[in-house]
Amino acid sequence: MILSDRTINQMIKNGELVVEPLEEYQIQPASIDLRLGSSFLKIDENLMEVMTLNDEIKYVNLERKEIIVPPNSFLLATTREYIKLPPDITAFVEGRSSIGRMGLFIQNAGWVDPGFEGQITLELYNANRLPIKLTAGRRICQLVLARMDKEAKTPYQGKYLYQKKAVGSRVYQDLENKQNKN
C-alpha cells in the first residue's frame, strides 16, 4: 500500500521515518519531493578502456552547486535529503514528470529497501541533443513509500548503507565476485 501525505507526516512527526532536511512543501499527496544535492560523479573514461562487473569503476568526483549534463550522457548525483526507512517501509524513486518531459531521466535502479539509511544516489541520463543545466536544491525526483505486509526479517545491510554524497557502483563487491576468487 502506497503511503498518503497524512501517513507520511505522522510517521515523520513520530520519528518512524527520517527525511532531513525537509520543507513542508516537499510532501505531496502520495510522495515526498526530493531535492538535488551538490555531489556528482561521472565515469572517468580516460582511466578505463572497458567497464566490467568484476572491477572497480573509476569516477571523477564533482562537488558544485550547478552542473551541466551534456547531451546523451550519464551522471550520478545524490539527493540533498538523508533518509532512514523503518523495517516495514520500502520506497522507490521516480523522476518528476516536469523534468522527464525535458528529456532528463532520473532513477535509482530499483527499490530502496526497508531499513535503508543514507542519501539516495540518483542516475541521471540526458536523452537530448542539448545540454541541461541543473542546480542543487531544486526538486528533482519523488520518493514513493509503501508499507510491506510484514516487517522485513532482515532490513537492508548492504554495501550502500549510510552512504553520503553520490556513490559509484560497487558491483565489484557482489557475492558472485567473491565466490569466483575462492
Swiss-Prot record:
Residues binding dCTP are 96-101, 113, 121-123, 142, 156, 163
* InterPro entries in alphabetical order: dCTP_deaminase (IPR011962), dUTPase-like_sf (IPR036157), dUTPase_trimeric (IPR033704)
Q: Which Enzyme Commission number(s) are listed?
A: 3.5.4.30
Q: Name one GO biological process term.
A: dUTP biosynthetic process
Kindly tell me the pathway this chain contributes to: Pyrimidine metabolism; dUMP biosynthesis; dUMP from dCTP: step 1/1
MF terms (GO), sorted A to Z: dCTP deaminase (dUMP-forming) activity; dCTP deaminase activity; nucleotide binding
Reaction(s) the record says it catalyses: dCTP + 2 H2O = dUMP + NH4(+) + diphosphate
UniProt xrefs under Pfam families: DCD (PF22769)
Q: Where is this site: Important for bifunctional activity?
A: 110-111
Keywords of the record, alphabetical order, are: Hydrolase, Nucleotide metabolism, Nucleotide-binding
Q: Which residues constitute the catalytic centre?
A: 123 (proton donor/acceptor)
Which enzyme class?
Answer: hydrolase
The protein's job, in short, is: Bifunctional enzyme that catalyzes both the deamination of dCTP to dUTP and the hydrolysis of dUTP to dUMP without releasing the toxic dUTP intermediate.
Q: Which PANTHER family match?
A: DCTP DEAMINASE
| Stated family | Belongs to the dCTP deaminase family.
Subunit (UniProt): Homotrimer.
Specify the protein name.
dCTP deaminase, dUMP-forming
Q: Which organism is it from?
A: Halothermothrix orenii (strain H 168 / OCM 544 / DSM 9562)
